[in-house]
């Protein structure tokens, strides 16, 4: 499985990590810089905390950040 780690930068996931994810949230600079974004591979879909959005998928490079487009 390959997952995006950043804008148009993907990497093959380590063994046992079969889920791609995008984690987004706002911090104090959200109004000027936009959402904070973490992308990558995981063994299971991370648990979202209040104010954090997480999207998971399980096909190659499926974790596209919607505001960047494809």
Curated annotation (Swiss-Prot):
Main location: secreted
GO CC annotation, single: extracellular region
One function term, GO molecular function aspect: toxin activity
InterPro entries the UniProt entry points to: Snake_3FTx (IPR003571), Snake_toxin-like_sf (IPR045860), Snake_toxin_con_site (IPR018354), Toxin_cobra-type (IPR054131)
Keyword list, A-Z: Acetylcholine receptor inhibiting toxin, Amidation, Disulfide bond, Ion channel impairing toxin, Neurotoxin, Postsynaptic neurotoxin, Secreted, Toxin
Serine amide PTM positions: 70
Protein name according to UniProt: Alpha-elapitoxin-Ast2a
């Amino acid at each position: 499985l390959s997952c995006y780690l950043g804008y148009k930068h993907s990497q093959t996931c380590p063994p046992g990590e079969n889920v791609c994810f995008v984690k987004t949230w706002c911090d104090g600079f959200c109004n000027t810089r936009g959402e904070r974004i973490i992308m990558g591979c995981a063994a299971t879909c991370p648990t979202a905390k209040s104010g954090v959005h997480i999207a998971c998928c399980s096909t190659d490079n499926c974790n596209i950040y919607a505001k960047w487009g494809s």
